[in-house]
């Protein structure tokens, strides 16, 4: 099964540089370190190929300023942000971003679920090229997740306007709503509704305050009864592209500047319950116990062992355990825990689960318990369109940037929209692979590199899609 490994392929283009230009870059690097704001962690830029930014069409300073301003909405004292979907903080941030869209000359609208679209007309009657991301965050999240792709998309429009470039396809910048999901427990909510994956059944979902999604939509000024109006018709889109931070360590550790995403991994999640017998912890001999927690602990290690035994980059997680009755002097009689498996290949997920079930059955026999599992989430992999991958790769190389092909282990809105149209994603490095935390960071040079690749990719797609 070695062929299931996802190789990291690298191509680095070196430019001849003079002694003078190297000296100027050294001085500029020291000066640049002084102007980083306290809103973002400090890091010296180790990426070499694009440090001068001489060939960029986008305005890196404008982009940085807009991102720094956005980071003020929901800023936490310890750094990072808390900007949950459908919260007042996110509403305020949305108002700011819609203002940026209008400044870029976009025609702005909000759909029935709260997704924001900014449209730039094309010169021909063609399907729309869609690109953007999200601005909501997890609790105590970082400043770059989603925001780089959202404001990077707006910067692409600015750059096109600055250069007086027209496109044949209409262009739409999209800010998807509630991508992270902690508010209602539904990830990629806005894009899921747009792709007809989610429907009116989600309107009664409640948050921790007891408010339903329908309640929040009314606060947005939307009519919940029109939720399905947010669905994007098939044939309306030419392609979707999302710029995002990697949220993993591969690009940062290998010093590769751009990730060309092969696809977004599939995710399957089970709710498991191990049932034993609750009994007195002091009077029940060890050889007479039916300890549900002991069994669940073995099950957790079984998940880890099975996933590690597979060649490739698959992952498996047991994220929590709920122990009942949860007292220090009572043998646990019931334990609830989830099992989550992710891989770019659905067959690999199913094979791992079969082996995990065999291990669970063995543990049940050893510990005298019964473990039952039920599927609660099953999301198929979203494979990037090969032609869009090629466009992104060529756009990177034309800008003198190194590339690597890699999968996305995280869920993204582009994956939902891939059900409707060809999809591609652009990754930029995340320092130490940290994300969903205040320490999340990508250098400004990497952010600008990714936005430049997005700019070039959109122009290439505009030309190539016409020829099909």
Which functions belong to the PLM regions below?
Residues 85, 319-326, 338-344, 370-389, ...:
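A short beta-alpha structural unit
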Residues 75-121:
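A non-catalytic alpha/beta surface segment that caps or lines the substrate-entry region
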Residues 262-264, 280, 284-310, 348, ...:
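His/Asp/Glu-rich mid-to-C-terminal helical/loop segments that flank catalytic regions of hydrolases
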Residues 131, 140-180, 268-274, 280-306, ...:
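Alpha-helical metal-binding/catalytic segments enriched in His/Glu/Asp
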Residues 45-81, 121, 330:
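N-terminal hydrophobic or amphipathic helices/low-complexity stretches enriched
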Residues 55, 63, 73-76, 129-133, ...:
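Zn-dependent metallopeptidase/amidohydrolase metal-coordination segment
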Residues 178-179, 183-347:
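Midchain, well-structured core segments that form catalytic/ion-binding scaffolds
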């Amino acid at each position: 099964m070695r062929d299931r490994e996802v190789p990291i392929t690298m191509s680095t283009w070196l430019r001849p540089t003079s002694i003078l230009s190297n000296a100027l870059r050294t001085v500029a690097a020291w000066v640049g370190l002084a102007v980083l704001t306290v809103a973002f962690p400090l890091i010296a830029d180790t990426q070499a190929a694009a440090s001068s930014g001489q060939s960029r069409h986008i305005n890196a300073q404008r982009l940085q300023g807009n991102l720094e301003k956005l980071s003020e909405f929901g800023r936490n004292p310890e750094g990072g942000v808390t900007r949950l979907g459908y919260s007042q903080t996110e509403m305020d941030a949305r108002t700011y971003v819609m203002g940026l869209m209008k400044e870029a000359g976009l025609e702005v609208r909000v759909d029935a679920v709260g997704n924001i679209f900014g449209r730039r007309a094309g010169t021909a009657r063609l399907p729309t090229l869609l690109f953007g991301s999200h601005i909501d965050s997890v609790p105590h999240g970082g400043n770059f997740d989603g925001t780089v792709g959202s404001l990077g998309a707006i910067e692409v429009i600015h750059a096109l306007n600055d250069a007086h470039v027209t496109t044949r396809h209409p262009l739409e910048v999209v800010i998807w709503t509630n991508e992270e999901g902690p508010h209602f427990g539904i990830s990629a909510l806005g894009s899921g509704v747009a792709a007809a994956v989610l429907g009116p059944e989600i309107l009664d979902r409640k948050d921790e305050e007891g408010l339903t999604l329908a309640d929040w939509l009314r606060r947005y000024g939307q009519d919940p009864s029109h939720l399905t109006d947010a669905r994007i018709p098939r044939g309306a889109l030419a392609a979707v592209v999302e710029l995002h931070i990697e949220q993993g360590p591969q690009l940062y550790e290998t010093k590769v500047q751009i990730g060309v995403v092969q696809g977004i991994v599939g995710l399957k999640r089970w709710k498991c319950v191990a049932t034993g017998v609750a009994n007195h912890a002091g009077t029940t001999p060890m050889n007479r116990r039916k300890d549900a927690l002991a069994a669940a602990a073995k099950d957790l290690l079984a998940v880890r062992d099975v996933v590690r035994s597979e060649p490739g980059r698959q992952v498996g997680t047991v994220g929590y355990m709920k122990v009942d009755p949860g007292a220090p002097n009572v043998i646990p009689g019931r334990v609830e825990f989830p099992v989550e498996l992710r891989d770019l290949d659905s067959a690999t997920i199913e094979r791992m689960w079969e082996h995990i079930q065999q291990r669970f059955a063995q543990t049940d026999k050893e510990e005298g318990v019964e473990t039952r599992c039920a599927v609660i989430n099953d999301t198929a992999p979203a494979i990037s369109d090969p032609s869009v991958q090629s466009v992104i790769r060529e756009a990177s190389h034309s800008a003198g940037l190194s590339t690597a092909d890699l999968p996305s282990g995280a869920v993204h809105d582009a994956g939902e929209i891939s059900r409707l149209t060809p999809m591609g994603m652009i990754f930029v490095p995340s320092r130490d692979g940290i994300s969903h935390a205040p320490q999340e960071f990508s250098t400004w040079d990497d952010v600008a590199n990714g936005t430049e690749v997005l700019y070039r990719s959109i122009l290439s797609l505009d030309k190539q899609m016409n020829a099909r």
